[in-house]
Amino acid sequence: METSALTELERIGAWTRDQLPVMRRRHELAAAANRLSGAGFVEIPGVTMSLTEAYAKGRDLAALFGTGIISNNDFTAEFKGELVHQHIGELKHLAGDADASAAFVAGLSGPVRQGLPNLLLNTGSSTARADLAAFSAVFGAALRATKPPPGMAEYQRELAAPTNADAAWQRLALLKGSGAPSQVLARTARLVLDEFAADPGQDWFGGALDEYRAYGLPGDSVTLALQVIADDPVAVRSVFAEMGRPPVELTRPERMNLLFEYARHRDADVADALGRTMATGSGVHNEQPGAHSADAAAFAFDAITTSASLGQDMPASAQGSMAELAASYGHEMIAGARIEDGESRDSGMTAPPHLSTIPGLTPSFYLSPQGTYGFLKTFAAEQKNTDTFDKAMGELRHDLLVQAARLDGEALRGSPPKDPGYFEVTAGGIGDLAGMEYAAALKTRGDMDAFDEQMRGIVTDTASLALGAAPSPEKGVRWLIWQLGMFGTGKALDAWEDGDPADTRVSKLDGARDKWILAQRYDIATKLWEGGFPADPPWPASLMKDGRPLPLEEPLKDSKIFETFSAWSDSTDTDGDGSTFDKKLAMGIRGTISPESAVTAKGYEKQP
């Protein structure tokens, strides 16, 4: 029997067995380099160490830093600090190799691993914060190793073992910013947060004052536990799904409420960390609005409805995160603000009956109008927070109106022509949310004088349309138009409630009033044009530039352009022609600027 084929297969198998460890290390080195650089593509050198050599490198550095420096009683603290600083570069390089890092961590003694932040500080190093960051990176890499040396199992057991507040603080300080696996971060944070769920009233301070100052970390272990998971969505959701078990059985909203209540009576760091975890667990930083994962959306629903119950009592340091959360869930905010579909409906994960269809709106859940208003109040007190929300809503407003205009226009060109009215419904949803935001800002700020003055200045100073804080002039105009909608809601609300006497906001608008109205008309008209909604006669060539309608700043600078636009718009309205361009324009303006939702929101304040 011919055996040459079998011999060849055996040769290939032997080669494969030799190559697999190298291939695995190439993969892990690439993953580590990608984590450190944040780049989409990474370039790494060839594998220069075998697995055995990587383990030896890690063990040698562990001996150097452990018994050689940190635990060496023959050296003064000052000399230890000099040695740590001298060799820290080797440690930073080690973080790029998970296998070598794992050998390093496994080679340290348990007391060194468990008390490293304190031990580093005791060396007297003037660069303790940077030194701890280097150690954290190595520990994170070690915990990501797929085939760690046996000693790593002991460290894993140490991390999972219950301990006192001081030791827990040391563990958390070392893992903060380490990039350790989600399950490790969650498990370590829960050692503190599980006890917190059982007895939130006890003293949660660990570590020492000099450690807080040296490392820039909070002394409150609850705060530090939240900071450790605050950038990892999987870890956040894991903690809030299990915190307190056993023996304390709580729902996720109850866990959130417990921490919000704690944050309201502690320093700003607690609320800041809690707000960040709410945003991270909701997928704010790693998912797209309108396309959130089921896990992130379910978390966000609980975060938003729980926060809404606090309203303007939300701690100030968490309000920025609430604005980011609202911006990321703009689809849900518009759906929740709809008052025509039932201002007294409850919040839920499924669509309520008879909810109007807004094309392009893809909410993952459905807030009640009252819940939407309550959540808006969690961040509306500060202009910088509403700016965050308004920038996102300006973009969404543009996209939804253009899509609705396109669908209505296509239907009108069908046979038989029939306008489904998506544009009006979409404009109404946008107007409802803008009105509620205005009411929330008015309630939390006490007055809107500063906002009004800003809006008046912008519409009378066309240079402001560039809006340097926006990523581009076009995005700046979209942001401005959203805020002008709020401005218009306030104007209409005054007229609604006060009959527009001489001393109201409306009467003080002077020349800005006409410009504001014209800006709204022009913007809505451009959305109809972008969507291809039919107009007869078509958009005038004199109002075009580079194949598009003139940008908004052009008519604001030249009133004659507005006159030409208004005359053309009026000419598109022919009695008996059904959904003409001008009629569609009027309905769009009426929808986007309405005081009804603001009046409804004010009514919620009167409820017990």
Segments and roles (model prediction):
Residues E2, D97, P181, D232, ...:
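Helix N-terminus capping/helix-initiation residues
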Residues E28-G38, V42, P247, Q403, ...:
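Charge-rich, low-complexity amphipathic helices
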Residues L36-P359:
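Long, composition-driven intrinsically disordered regions
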Residues A268-P608:
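Long, contiguous all-alpha helical interaction modules
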